[in-house]
Every structure is written in structure tokens, then in C-alpha cells.
């Protein structure tokens, strides 16, 4: 069994609205394969703005 790891830091606040849903898609062309997400991790930090501190 071959295992791959994908790790990417993306500043989502620059490209998506405040509320989003995340999905996955995979393909192997004409061949059949099972794609499984065995682990998922999400980390978010909310930075306070001057308006939210008031």
C-alpha cells in the first residue's frame, strides 16, 4: 500500500467567505481506485480586529 501526505498552509481568509464547507475530489483517469481520507486536521486562529475589541 502506498501512502501519501499532503500538507499545505493556505491563508483562507484571503480567498473564501467567513463560512465554508470543505470537500475532497480525486481521480486516476480510466483506472479504478479507492481514495480514502484517513486523517483530517484543521486549525483556525481568529485575529481580533480593532472593531471586535470595542
Curated annotation (Swiss-Prot):
The keyword Transport does not apply. Transmembrane segments: none annotated. Signal peptide: none annotated. Pfam families: Lectin_legB. The keyword RNA-binding does not apply. InterPro entries: ConA-like_dom_sf, Lectin_LegA_CS, Legume_lectin_dom. It comes from the Eukaryota. One of its GO terms (molecular function) is carbohydrate binding. Keywords: Lectin. Belongs to the leguminous lectin family. Tetramer of two alpha and two beta chains. This is Lectin alpha chain. It comes from Lathyrus tingitanus.
